[in-house]
């Protein structure tokens, strides 16, 4: 029935495609139908997710189903008369980068299990930086060799080939990680794949944007060093922007009484995070890097200055927005295979690129894993940080490509642009279906341990703070709820609420905080001497102590400090 409705709607004024944008009423009609189609598909994807999870079906993930459903609907739209709705539901990189990607990146940083992440930080950074570079160069060289042979009349420059390599080096293992969650796979493997993926996207984006600056220019030996310099500067300035805005948010929550107004507090936290993304993009830096580290900083510091309601709201709002975006993206990708009519498909090039993507992932994972294992054996002689072969194989299998690559491909220009975009889209969908659809089976084949309990359940990390467990806190919450429901202020006659929220005490309290903060800064100034005189094995422990004893006292409320140093 839906098919009949769609065909009838598309047939209406099907000959008026050239008038697209000239009739506002007709444009609004088609926009409504396009959004309706996408929302129905999104609801269907979420209901599928509910069914799969409730029935504990692990053989296939709902994201793969979402891609197939998107492909079917995209095919229906393609064969129907008219192009207006077809153009509206096609993949647009602007929508992706400005609307769909930020919630996913923010939630990734905010939900990051920091103790596991930093415990495996060396391995994660190795795969994210060196691994992405190896993948991009390997893929770029293989693609360039193919174009040099001039099959299918495809001729590419070396910069175009490397840009293609950077585009298809962005991994997106959402499907794999979701299956890992359902199987409760070992946290070490989960953390390495998760950490690599979130940093890998940022590295791939910065690498692609760096290469685009050399498009059409003559390459020299020093171009390599120039490109590396631009990459490093862009990455670390973006990181600094994200961390700075996260720290500013933590201080804002500490020195204000926003916790009295949880709805305003939650809105400000969300907007501050998005500010880091768009400010960084506006400065020609990487918004993905900024937003990722802003989310990590918010969770590490600002989280403990939030009210209990703000903790709940930010956690689940970020998670809901990310899940909606992820499902929407998979549907979007499936539809785009048929709705983007200007793409140029070259079957042999697509096949060669798919093989090259697999080869580049192999050249990334296995040599680096062996190098890391050798380093860990020589350094400490134990097997705690050892990456077994089964984990290496799973890392290789988890390297499926995602929507970031498709969005980056929109930046291609020149006569090969449509071919490169089409190839990227097909390779992404193929890897999602092949690797994502067989992940559960690979876990069984590799005999990877499952049913492992997580160190910390993410839903239990929002614990009541000591002062929130008191009867006064319940009275305060009741007072605020009554205040929200009526215009009359409600005053609670309790010493706790008077000390914390009496406006007459704000100035003295702030002066005490500022004085205490100045003393903490003085302590921090001399603490770095210990770091540079400590051994390499003690530096990680020193950084942890420095964070808990110096940085957190500056950024966290004294009442929240004990809770904030538990992680």
UniProtKB/Swiss-Prot annotation:
Keywords: Antiport, Golgi apparatus, Ion transport, Membrane, Phosphoprotein, Sodium, Sodium transport, Transmembrane, Transmembrane helix, Transport. The keyword Transport applies. GO terms for molecular function: potassium:proton antiporter activity; sodium:proton antiporter activity. InterPro entries: Cation/H_exchanger_CPA1 (IPR018422), Cation/H_exchanger_TM (IPR006153), NaH_exchanger (IPR004709). Signal peptide: none annotated. Residues 1-31, 86-87, 150-159, 210-227, 299-315, 367-392, 446-567 are lumenal. This is Uncharacterized Na(+)/H(+) antiporter C15A10.06. It comes from Schizosaccharomyces pombe (strain 972 / ATCC 24843) (Fission yeast). GO terms for cellular component: cytoplasm; early endosome; fungal-type vacuole membrane; Golgi apparatus; Golgi membrane; late endosome. Belongs to the monovalent cation:proton antiporter 1 (CPA1) transporter (TC 2.A.36) family. Its main location: Golgi. Residues 53-64, 109-128, 181-188, 249-277, 339-347, 414-424 are cytoplasmic. It comes from the Eukaryota. GO terms for biological process: potassium ion transmembrane transport; proton transmembrane transport; sodium ion transmembrane transport; vacuolar acidification. Gene3D superfamilies: 6.10.140.1330. It is found in: Golgi apparatus membrane. NCBIfam families: b_cpa1. The modification Phosphoserine is found at residue 515. The keyword Transferase does not apply. The chain crosses the membrane at residues 32-52, 65-85, 88-108, 129-149, 160-180, 189-209, 228-248, 278-298, 316-338, 348-366, 393-413, 425-445. It is a multi-pass membrane protein.
């Amino acid at each position: 029935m839906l098919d009949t409705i769609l065909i009838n709607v598309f047939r209406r004024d099907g000959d008026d495609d050239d008038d697209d944008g000239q009739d506002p009423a007709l444009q609004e009609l088609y926009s409504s139908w396009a959004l309706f189609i996408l929302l129905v598909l999104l609801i269907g994807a979420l209901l599928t997710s509910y069914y799969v999870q409730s029935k504990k079906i692990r053989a296939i993930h709902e994201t793969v189903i979402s891609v197939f459903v998107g492909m079917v609907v995209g095919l229906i739209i393609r064969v129907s008369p008219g192009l207006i709705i077809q153009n509206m539901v096609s993949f647009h990189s602007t929508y992706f980068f400005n609307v769909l990607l930020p919630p996913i990146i923010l939630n990734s940083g905010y939900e990051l299990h920091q103790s596991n992440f930093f415990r495996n930080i060396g391995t994660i950074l190795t795969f994210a930086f060196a691994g992405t570079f190896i993948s991009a160069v390997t893929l770029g060289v293989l693609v360039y060799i193919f174009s040099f042979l001039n099959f299918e009349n495809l001729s590419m420059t070396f910069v175009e080939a490397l840009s293609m390599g950077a585009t298809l080096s962005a991994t997106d293992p959402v499907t794999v990680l979701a299956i890992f969650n359902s199987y409760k796979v070992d946290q070490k493997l989960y953390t390495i794949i998760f950490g690599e993926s979130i940093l890998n996207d940022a590295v791939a984006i910065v690498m692609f944007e760096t290469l685009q600056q050399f498009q059409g220019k003559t390459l020299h030996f020093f171009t390599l060093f120039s490109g590396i310099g631009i990459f490093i500067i862009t990455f670390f300035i973006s990181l600094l922007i994200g961390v700075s805005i996260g720290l500013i948010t933590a201080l804002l929550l500490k020195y204000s009484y926003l916790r009295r107004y949880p709805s305003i507090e939650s809105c400000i936290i969300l907007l501050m995070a998005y500010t880091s993304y768009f400010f960084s993009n506006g400065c020609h830096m990487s918004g993905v890097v900024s937003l990722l580290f802003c989310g990590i900083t918010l969770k590490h510091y600002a989280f403990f200055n939030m009210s209990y309601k703000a903790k709940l709201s930010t956690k689940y709002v970020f998670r809901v927005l990310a899940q909606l975006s992820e499902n929407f993206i998979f549907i979007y990708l499936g539809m785009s295979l048929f709705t983007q009519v200007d793409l140029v498909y070259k079957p042999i090039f697509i096949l060669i690129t798919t093989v090259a993507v697999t080869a580049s992932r192999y050249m990334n994972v296995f040599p680096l894993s062996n190098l890391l294992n050798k380093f860990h054996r020589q350094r400490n002689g134990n097997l705690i940080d050892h990456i077994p072969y089964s984990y290496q194989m799973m890392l290789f299998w988890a390297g499926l490509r995602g929507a970031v690559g498709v969005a980056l491909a929109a930046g291609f220009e020149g006569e090969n642009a449509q071919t490169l975009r089409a190839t990227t889209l097909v390779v992404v969908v193929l890897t999602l279906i092949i690797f994502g659809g067989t992940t559960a089976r690979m876990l069984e084949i590799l005999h990877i341990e499952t049913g492992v309990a997580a160190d910390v359940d993410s839903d239990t990390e929002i614990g009541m703070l000591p002062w929130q467990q008191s009867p006064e806190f319940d009275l305060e919450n009741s007072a605020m709820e009554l205040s929200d429901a009526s215009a009359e202020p409600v005053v609670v006659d309790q010493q706790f609420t008077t000390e914390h929220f009496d406006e007459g005490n704000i100035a003295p309290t702030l002066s005490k905080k500022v004085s205490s903060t100045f003393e903490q800064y003085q302590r921090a100034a001399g603490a770095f001497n210990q770091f540079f005189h400590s051994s390499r094995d003690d530096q990680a422990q020193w950084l942890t102590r420095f964070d808990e004893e110096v940085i957190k006292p500056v950024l966290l409320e004294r009442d929240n400090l004990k809770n904030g140093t538990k992680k």
